């Protein structure tokens, strides 16, 4: 169930999380909205000066109410996304951060950077050199080390398909696809080895339909599915 409570770090921060297979929409004090994917947790900390969100794990879509005097900051992994009024998707999976801009502008900087000049739309001469500014349709991908790259033409419909109860994979590494599928089902999938985790998976699946996903892997790749007593399924390379 969705829970909202004071986080242990500070009484000012509200903590929300969704369970496996559960999605919810939060409406914040300024009418900004956060759509939480399954198995997702966020901290929400609003102050008179800033709107601060930490994505602890999972995925969320942010529809930010405009407030030029109060930047909206979302920290995930090693990155912070700064917005004034916009819509964007942020995902944290396997220590990688994915930021997809749907409309407006955002600036992406290293987590913990509270430089007040780091806001979208300012003169680029005022921005630190490591700040990336995104335009609609772009996706930033940052690895565990913080190194990032920008995809200039991301497929917004595919990336946000989770909001419609679908997962749309296009040559997705199986390891990442498994992490995403596991948000929606208590049948936990595990890649048997790195070679299996690197397989490129394509297709559209209903969220939570783990059996159909495993069946597709068996048909197209000939993998072996080992079913454990605890309900998990280990995906092994073809025999």
Feature roles, as predicted:
Residues 1-239:
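A residue-level detector for the "anchor" residue at the start of short, highly conserved motifs
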């Amino acid at each position: 169930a969705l829970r909202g409570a004071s986080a242990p770090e500070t009484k000012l921060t509200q903590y929300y999380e969704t369970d496996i297979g559960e999605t919810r929409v939060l409406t914040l004090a300024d009418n900004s909205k956060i759509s939480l994917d399954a198995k997702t947790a966020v901290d929400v900390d609003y102050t008179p000066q800033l709107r601060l969100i930490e994505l602890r794990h999972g995925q969320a879509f942010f529809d930010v109410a405009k407030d030029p005097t109060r930047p909206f900051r979302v920290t995930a992994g090693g990155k912070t996304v700064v917005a004034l009024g916009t819509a964007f998707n942020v995902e944290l999976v396997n220590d990688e951060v994915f930021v997809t801009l749907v409309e407006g502008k955002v600036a992406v900087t290293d987590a913990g950077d509270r430089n007040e000049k780091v806001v979208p739309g300012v003169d680029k001469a005022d921005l630190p050199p490591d700040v990336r500014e995104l335009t609609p349709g772009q996706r930033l991908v940052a690895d565990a080390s913080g190194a990032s790259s920008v995809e200039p033409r991301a497929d917004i419909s595919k990336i946000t398909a989770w909001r419609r109860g679908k997962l749309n994979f296009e040559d997705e590494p199986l390891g990442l696809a498994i992490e995403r599928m596991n948000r929606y089902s208590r049948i936990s999938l595990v890649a048997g080895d790195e070679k299996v985790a690197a397989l490129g998976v394509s297709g559209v699946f209903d969220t939570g339909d783990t059996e159909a996903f495993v069946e597709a892997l068996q048909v197209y790749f000939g993998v072996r599915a080992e079913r454990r007593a605890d309900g998990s399924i280990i995906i092994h390379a073809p025999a």
